[in-house]
């Protein structure tokens, strides 16, 4: 059914199509083989029939970009063993694929600090409940500016997230077979590759400005990885017959009323 056909029968049409496409980072190398949108991977392991039914899990070191619950969920699936997921309703084809998962290191990157992370306390703590995963945070990444301190005062959830991250940073190294590193103040600037495939992700070290924002320091690091998952948000897709601003990723509107042109 087209929008024009619906207009013949309805006085108003509400478009609640959501944002389903993975946002891109806008950096060189995103088209190399081994780059994935988190939403695509979530669709795979949730068994969504609109997504791939098989997945390349040959990467031993993986980068996950983003510091929200989606990035945690993707990291958890990559770091856990397939057998640990049998208590869930994991589809058979996903279990079979994850049995072949070779990931031993998962590196999560956020360009700002702990107080700006969008994790929920429960999700962050659950990450550490698996006996096969060691969550690692560099003590040097536990840093706060004035705005960060105020954010902790203003929201208990933010303070709990910071406390959990601090506890990860303070403990002694463990012997779990899978390592999950959470890196703050690292802004991805390029995905590197050879022969068309991901070989590393390059980040720039950032520092807090005092208001919760960050500035690049000009110090760069290349992290050897064979796959990159971006969990940096979702982008709405256009609807046939409705104007769409690709730059702003919105339907041109006036107070919510879609403009004809």
Locate predicted features.
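Feature captures the FAD/FMN-dependent oxidoreductase FAD-binding
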Residues: 1-32, 183, 189-202
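Core beta-strand elements of the Rossmann-like FAD/NAD(P) dinucleotide-binding domain
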Residues: 5-12, 57-59, 215-226
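Structured loop/turn residues at beta-strand edges in well-structured enzyme cores
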Residues: 8, 30, 57, 101-104, ...
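Glycine-/small-residue-rich beta->alpha transition segments that form the dinucleotide
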Residues: 12, 16-23, 30, 39, ...
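Glycine-rich dinucleotide-binding loop and its adjacent helix/turn
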Residues: 22-100, 246-260
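FAD-site-proximal beta/loop scaffold in flavoenzymes
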Residues: 33-52, 191-197, 209-261
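Dinucleotide-binding/catalytic capping subdomain of oxidoreductase cores
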Residues: 72, 76-221, 252-257
